[in-house]
């Protein structure tokens, strides 16, 4: 049995060749943040694609709605895949809140992947990333 000795540089090069190539992720290469489809009737605002947006963010619709309603300080309900807000709020404001929710409660702060789970233990909330395994605390709402 003969043993071939490799230099440190050769071993290092071999190890690097076995690692998966790391891609640079540009904003939106893999995940595109959806926008709300909003209509107004009187003093009510309807978000028609609310369930679809919540599913794309991997969050329950009532959780997303609770965040939005607390931020705009208006009452509202979720029914049949549509969110109904009782009050006047612009589509631009709602989409900015959606972007803020994504940055604070969906996107992993370590690897910036959108593949996360929101975990609530007692009074604490965490984001657990399914891509890198990181667990990061977030401000409860």
Curated annotation (Swiss-Prot):
The keyword Coiled coil does not apply. The keyword Ribosomal protein does not apply. Gene3D superfamilies: 3.30.30.170. Keywords: Initiation factor, Protein biosynthesis. It comes from the Archaea. Transmembrane segments: none annotated. InterPro entries: IF2/IF5, TIF2_bsu_arc, Transl_init_fac_IF2/IF5_dom, Transl_init_fac_IF2/IF5_N, Transl_init_fac_IF2/IF5_Zn-bd. eIF-2 functions in the early steps of protein synthesis by forming a ternary complex with GTP and initiator tRNA. Belongs to the eIF-2-beta/eIF-5 family. NCBIfam families: PRK03988.1. Heterotrimer composed of an alpha, a beta and a gamma chain. This is Translation initiation factor 2 subunit beta. It comes from Thermofilum pendens (strain DSM 2475 / Hrk 5).
